[in-house]
């Protein structure tokens, strides 16, 4: 047998059958659910008189609609309260593990599963959420799915899928100070495009990823979907194993040793054949900020907003639309642009190390006058850990609001929203029109440290200059 990639190995191990259509019926090892995409799926089960096939392989939490300030029940938003109640009823009826607000384990679904040790190498993972690719950081194959597919996994613990091609994305070298995992993935998406990964799984490889901690790797894999890929992964290694060891749902004792041995075996082989290979140099990546209305419209902080004639013809129409919506002029510097709101959080950048890096920037400074800045931990565990380290005090002393765990201003499904055409510096993953709650609200994606730099200067800034 020829040398294989991790993707091929995990896919083959989870193949139930090849269907007449050519699709694969793929077993799903872990199903994560939340309040937004699960109610309709449970209703479909009820209509057909079906039960959840493997409730022990399903884990639920509430994240999208959660208020990050007043969490008193019933929620002020009646639709949010309805979704919350539906999740409570459905998980109880089907004996599904549920992490509610105040449990100590609630949070964004893509934050809580890794921190509890639920996400492990070699798994297939599905969730009714675009950013399920996050879990690929562990060497898992993880897909975001739609509501009808949520129903299928609940009922049959499997999905009918077309097998993906595999593109190896190599990044080698050391990242300069002030350059983070978020900058790496924004750079990759900028270069390959938001449609560049369609039909692919992305394998991230090279010394730059090897040097990253697990939370940084999760940031990279999280935004694979923004680059058009269905999933993205990094081969498991000693960093992966060290992160998982001792976590609640990780194997223990002899089972741990056996698991690590197996996890090593599923990594892509050195001479594995890929459908495509793309290489980047870490030294070419600087703090990166989006200027437009797609995650692919990014530039280094030292660059101006691109002019129309500098872009590929295929990118010019969306660029023209972006100039108008974002109120930017071609050729203008992004650095120095005044910001209104600064948001640190999300499933991309709401983990402890993200908050630590932002706190280094904020410490000893004050949020600029007229800027609203707030920090939303990705989970109750992250919040507790951050408070134990005194990060909440650093942020609050600098004038940031310190909130409860949730998805918050990443999307407009809770009270945290932009007003009018406010400009947001955000550590989240999407900068689409209206994404943060206002039909004319504008979003600049950047690393948490860059958001902190924007908050204290009141404008888009180079974090390297703030850090000195």
From Swiss-Prot:
Cofactor notes: Binds 1 [4Fe-4S] cluster per subunit.
Metabolic or biological pathway: Amino-acid biosynthesis; L-leucine biosynthesis; L-leucine from 3-methyl-2-oxobutanoate: step 2/4
MF annotations from Gene Ontology: 3-isopropylmalate dehydratase activity; 4 iron, 4 sulfur cluster binding; metal ion binding
Keyword Metal-binding: yes
UniProt GO BP: L-leucine biosynthetic process
Superkingdom of origin: Bacteria
Enzyme Commission (EC) number: 4.2.1.33
Record-listed [4Fe-4S] cluster binding positions: 347, 407, 410
Pfam families per record: Aconitase
Entries under InterPro entries matching the protein: 3-IsopropMal_deHydase_lsu, Acnase/IPM_dHydase_lsu_aba_1/3, Acoase/IPM_deHydtase_lsu_aba, Aconitase_4Fe-4S_BS, Aconitase_4Fe-4S_dom, IPM_dehydratase_rel_enz, IPMI_cat
UniProt keyword annotations, A-Z: 4Fe-4S, Amino-acid biosynthesis, Branched-chain amino acid biosynthesis, Iron, Iron-sulfur, Leucine biosynthesis, Lyase, Metal-binding
Cofactor(s) the protein needs: [4Fe-4S] cluster
Catalytic reaction list: (2R,3S)-3-isopropylmalate = (2S)-2-isopropylmalate
Record text on subunit structure and interactions: Heterodimer of LeuC and LeuD.
Function description: Catalyzes the isomerization between 2-isopropylmalate and 3-isopropylmalate, via the formation of 2-isopropylmaleate.
Family label: Belongs to the aconitase/IPM isomerase family. LeuC type 1 subfamily.
The name this protein goes by in its record: 3-isopropylmalate dehydratase large subunit
Species this chain originates from: Synechocystis sp. (strain ATCC 27184 / PCC 6803 / Kazusa)
Gene name of the record: leuC
């Amino acid at each position: 047998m020829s040398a294989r990639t991790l993707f091929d190995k995990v896919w083959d191990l989870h193949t139930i059958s090849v269907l007449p259509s050519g699709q694969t019926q793929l077993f799903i090892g872990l199903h994560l659910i939340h309040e937004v995409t699960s109610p309709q799926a449970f209703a479909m089960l009820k209509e057909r008189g079906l039960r959840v096939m493997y409730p022990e392989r399903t884990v639920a939490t509430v994240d999208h609609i959660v208020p990050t300030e007043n969490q008193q029940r019933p929620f002020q938003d009646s639709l949010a309260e309805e979704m919350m109640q539906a999740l409570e009823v459905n998980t109880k009826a089907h004996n599904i593990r549920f992490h509610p607000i105040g449990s100590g384990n609630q949070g964004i679904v893509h934050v809580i599963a890794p921190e509890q040790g639920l996400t492990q190498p070699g798994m297939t993972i599905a969730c009714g959420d675009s950013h399920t690719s996050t879990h690929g950081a562990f060497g898992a194959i993880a897909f975001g799915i739609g509501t009808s597919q949520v129903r299928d996994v609940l009922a049959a613990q499997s999905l009918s899928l077309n097998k993906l091609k595999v593109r190896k994305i190599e990044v080698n070298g050391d990242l300069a100070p002030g350059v983070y995992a978020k900058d790496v993935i924004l750079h990759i998406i900028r270069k390959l495009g938001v449609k560049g990964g369609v039909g692919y799984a992305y394998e991230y490889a090279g010394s730059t990823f090897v040097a990253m901690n697990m939370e940084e790797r999760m940031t990279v894999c999280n935004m694979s979907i923004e680059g058009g890929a269905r999933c993205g992964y990094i081969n498991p290694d000693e960093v992966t194993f060290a992160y998982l060891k001792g976590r609640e749902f990780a194997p223990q004792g002899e089972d741990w040793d056996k698991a690590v041995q197996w996890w090593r075996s599923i990594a892509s082989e050195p001479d594995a054949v890929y459908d495509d290979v793309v290489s980047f140099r870490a030294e070419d990546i600087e703090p990166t900020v989006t200027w437009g209305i797609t995650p692919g419209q990014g530039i280094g902080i030292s660059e101006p907003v691109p002019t129309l004639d500098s872009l590929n013809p295929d990118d010019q129409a969306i660029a023209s639309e972006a100039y108008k919506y974002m109120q930017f002029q071609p050729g203008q510097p992004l650095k120095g642009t005044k910001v209104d709101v600064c948001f640190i959080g999300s499933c991309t950048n709401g983990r402890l190390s993200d908050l630590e890096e932002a706190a280094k920037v904020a410490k000893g400074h004050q949020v600029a006058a007229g800027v609203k800045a707030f920090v939303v931990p990705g989970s109750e565990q992250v919040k507790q850990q951050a408070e134990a380290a005194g990060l909440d005090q650093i942020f609050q002393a600098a004038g940031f609001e310190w909130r409860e765990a949730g998805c918050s201003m990443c999307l407009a499904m809770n009270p945290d929203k932009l007003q009018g055409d406010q400009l947001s510096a955000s550590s989240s993953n999407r900068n689409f029109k209206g994404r943060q709650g206002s039909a004319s609200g504008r979003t600049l994606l950047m690393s948490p440290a860059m958001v902190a730099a924007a908050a204290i200067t009141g404008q888009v800034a180079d974090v390297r200059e703030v850090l000195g």
